[in-house]
Regions:
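ABC ATPase C-loop
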Residues: 47-48
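Helical segment within the ABC ATPase nucleotide-binding domain
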Residues: 70-82
Length: 133
């Protein structure tokens, strides 16, 4: 990895298992045998192992079913509660804004709208153009 740990990482692993309990049950299973949502949890857990202050997520729900998407957003909320700042790019704007402290809507690569997640969800221009009404 990019950063090698010299401390006892067992405590960090325990924190990851508390965030993602299914991973404890699947710890002896190969990652390739896990579901898409479980693999995303492994990816989040790996990123959290270095105790980052900022976590960057690029389309974390891409290619997963709606049920798994809801589960992943629940996990992102759990990570947010650990005081890790999250910078996320996400096509599912409505759900992403619903959990965001701050949001930016880009149009052809330029920032068109910004505000709190709640402000953007309530902005009629954002709703009609990007959130389906």
């Amino acid at each position: 990895g990019a950063y090698l740990r010299n401390d006892n990482y067992q405590n960090v692993i325990e924190e990851i298992y508390e965030l993602f309990p299914i991973l404890r049950k699947k710890k002896y299973q190969l990652v390739g045998e896990l579901s898409g949502g479980q693999r995303q949890q492994v990816a989040l857990g790996r990123a959290l192992m270095i105790k980052p202050s900022v976590l960057m997520l690029d389309e974390p729900t891409a290619g997963v079913s709606p049920i798994v998407m809801d589960e992943l957003f629940d996990h992102i909320i759990k990570v947010k509660r650990t005081n890790v700042a999250i910078l996320m790019v996400e096509q599912n704007a409505k759900q992403a804004l619903s959990i965001s402290d701050r949001g930016y809507v880009l149009v052809t690569g330029e920032n068109r709208y910004s505000g709190t997640g709640k402000e953007l969800l309530n902005d009629s221009r954002v709703r009609s153009s990007f959130l389906g009404g």
